Amino acid sequence: MSDGNERNQDGNNTPSQGGEQTRSSRLSLRPAGRQEVGRTVDAGSVRQSFSHGRSKVVQVEVRKPKRNAAGPGAGAAARGGRAGGRALTAAELAARQRALELQRKAAAEEAARREEEKIQIMSAAEAARRAAEEERLISEQKAAEIAALKESEQQAAREQAAAEAAARAAEQAAAEAAAREAEEAARSAPLDPRSHSTGGVQLAAPVQRLRPLAERAIMPPRPVQPSRPAAAAPARNNETLHLRSGAAAGGDDERRPAPRRSGPGAPPAPPRRPSAPSRKGGGSDRRSGRIDVRAAIEGDDDKTRSLASVRRQRDRERRQAELERLRSDQVRVVRDVIVPETITVAELANRMAARQGEVIKALMKMGVMATAAQSIDGDTAELVVEEFGHRIKRVSESDVEIGIEGVEDNADDLKPRAPVVTVMGHVDHGKTSLLDALRTTDVAASEAGGITQHIGAYQITAPSGKKITFIDTPGHEAFTSMRARGASVTDIVVLVVAADDGVMPQTIEAIKHAKAANAPIIVAINKIDKPGANPNRVRQELLNHEIVVEEMGGDTQDVEVSALKRIGLDKLEECILLQSEMLDLKANPDRVAEGVVIESRLDRGRGPVAALLVQKGTLRRGDIVVAGAEWGRVRAVLDDRGRQVKEAGPSMPVEVLGLTGVPGAGEPFVVVENDARAREISEFRQRKIKEKEAASQVAARGTLDQMLARIQAGVQKEVALLIKADVQGSAEAISTTVQKLAHEEVAVRVLNASVGQITESDIQLAKASDAIIVAFNVRATTQARELAQREGVDIRYYSIIYQVADDVEQLVKGKVAPKHREKFLGYAEVRQVFNITKTGKVAGCYVTEGLVKRGCGVRLLRDNVVIHEGELSQLKRFKDDVKEVARGYECGLSFAGYNDLREGDMVECYEMEVIPA
């Protein structure tokens, strides 16, 4: 066989009687456990051939289908048992049932396989149908494109035919003009017509067309003969210039278009096909069978190209020319290149449409070595742009803030607004109590220690119906920045002075802030109900600070009030409203909101909360606000009593929720048009803040390094603090206060001052820096508290600011090294020197002044010059050790490690005492 398998002869000669016996016998159990239902088996062997001459003999079986026995007896015999009539045993019955079960399973598997093949065939048919449908759609699309292309070519052919008709009309007009000129020439100089014969000279087609006109103009009229035109036609045909082999059969068709021939005898003109315009003028005449001398001389016999091909060629040439023009050094495209303060070399090359290598080469010529990823400053980039011949446009990063404040308001749009009044004065002079009396609230009771430590804004309605906005500022000396912020946003300053206390340091500071803000002052002399109150003393003390009240001939209003007894409150409101009318306060409510951040904090449940004072426009819920370096969409607007409002007009203090972070107190806020603008401005301001911090760190690095070196050397110590407060203003005030407590030997370093709860990251920072956490009106989270206990970090909670200052001062004093001072004890004169074997030299001395103590410091003076300074090792009187020897007594002295003693030397005794810091 060709496949390498050979049938053994023994397998071919297998007797068939075994098969007949199998067909006649019934189902039986084989020893191997394999069941066969009446099939004959032909056994044999096959030799398989492999590569490299190898072969192998394997045994094979050929199964043949069983032949069904005819008649009912066969089935009965199969059901009833063997031929002998013996009943089936249980094992045979079980084997038969298993065989039947296997057959059913095989049939079910075969049916499932056929069903799966059917599904696969149907899926393949569906895929083929879809592919055919897609091919049909593609072919239809291509046919539509071909039809559109043919239509465009036909349109071009029609346009070409129209152009040819126009050219023929122009040619005919030129011929008529030439005929008129020839007629005029003939009239002026008549000649013999026979002398004008061509004489065998072949003329061009335009000349032949003009010849009949010239002959009629020159020769006299003759009687018309019927046979002359037919005879003249061959003559004219013989005189025509033939340049192509098929031109003789054309006759006048070469000179005149075919449609002019008409009549029953004229042969039908062949249908004209639209021809594409040729690259030269004679292409269409060559197609129609006519030609002029110019085309014949040029000899343009090339095949005509299609319009699409010509258009593509022209586009390629135009693009190539433009590319060559751009690449050439002589022609450059001048661009407007926008250059910021800093730009990378790659970005600069991209904006100039130049190669990065060329830009780097230009920088190298300028002495600047830079890679494509490095940044260069704007001045260097400007030189590069000018070197490349472009126009530069310098921009700054701060340009993102251009136009953020809007335009100036029109005077017609301004409307009266409520005055903003800031209450200032010394601590415990009753500022908050006065505001509580005006608002009929009790804010002072909620403040820790009875002093104001937050800046608050409130709005009240006077009995006249007009509104007044009050800003309460702290009076403690630590809150200087808060008072400055309050004075900067105010219209009127109410200076509260206690009648029993007079002008105090913070009162003077408040006067300076008010004058710096150029705000009018109204003096409120409070606590007039207390015994010992003297308002006139207050007025006189104010004269020392250039505050002259009206009672003393000045222009500053003063009101005597009592917040506790509610005396003079209505008069104070009248003075405020009168002053606001004099100032003529107005604002435009119909514009985007602008204002200032009064205070800010981080609330655990609500997130960043900012107290805003609207100065212009109207702030609404949903506006996008940029406050300092933070931005966000306003989610809620709350008034001073915690009620939600939809909008806030000018001079209205509100709290807003929805900012991404805690803005700085005193920062301006403004409403912008979209999120992208707000995010851009916020990122720019945050970047500026980081750059400023980095610059300050670099500037202070030398001092800081020196301080750390002194700390490591033990010369200087430090107190590291991490401040966490409830509001931004308190954090600033505490940071400023503790830094003023630094000692020349102990430095106070504030690692961070922020708002919000104490978190695990704060504990880790304090642990790494060995710092103490100062918590002002905030608490630590559960996880942070557990971590602090494990790490041993000290967290100190405060609610009053002067307690913070006192504790930090004690910490600083505890780290200050105690000072030592020398205390003089007395003098002793050396009168005799004894040499003791074990002890060395011992000086016998007489105490001339003071006393001598054992273990004190001594100086040995010889001729009033100190020759030794050390300690006294032994002090004896006779042979007994004593603690001290007074004046007028003799004693024996020995010095530790020194024996150069002489008679007449003086011993000065002293001791060091510790002075607490």
From Swiss-Prot:
Where is there biased composition of kind Low complexity?
Answer: 69-84, 154-177, 227-236
Asked if 4Fe-4S is a keyword of the record, the answer is no
Answer whether the UniProt record assigns the keyword Cytoplasm to this protein.
yes
Q: What does this protein do?
A: One of the essential components for the initiation of protein synthesis. Protects formylmethionyl-tRNA from spontaneous hydrolysis and promotes its binding to the 30S ribosomal subunits. Also involved in the hydrolysis of GTP during the formation of the 70S ribosomal complex.
Which HAMAP family does this entry report, sorted A to Z?
Answer: IF_2_B
- Name assigned to this protein: Translation initiation factor IF-2
Subcellular location field:
Cytoplasm
Ranges of biased composition (kind: Basic and acidic residues): 282-305
Could you tell me which species this protein originates from? Gluconobacter oxydans (strain 621H) (Gluconobacter suboxydans)
Family matches, as SUPFAM superfamilies = Initiation factor IF2/eIF5b, domain 3 (SSF52156), P-loop containing nucleoside triphosphate hydrolases (SSF52540), Translation proteins (SSF50447)
Q: Which UniProt keywords apply?
A: Cytoplasm, GTP-binding, Initiation factor, Nucleotide-binding, Protein biosynthesis
User: Where's the tr-type G domain?
Assistant: 416-586
Q: Which CDD domains match?
A: IF2_eIF5B (cd01887), IF2_mtIF2_II (cd03702), mtIF2_IVc (cd03692)
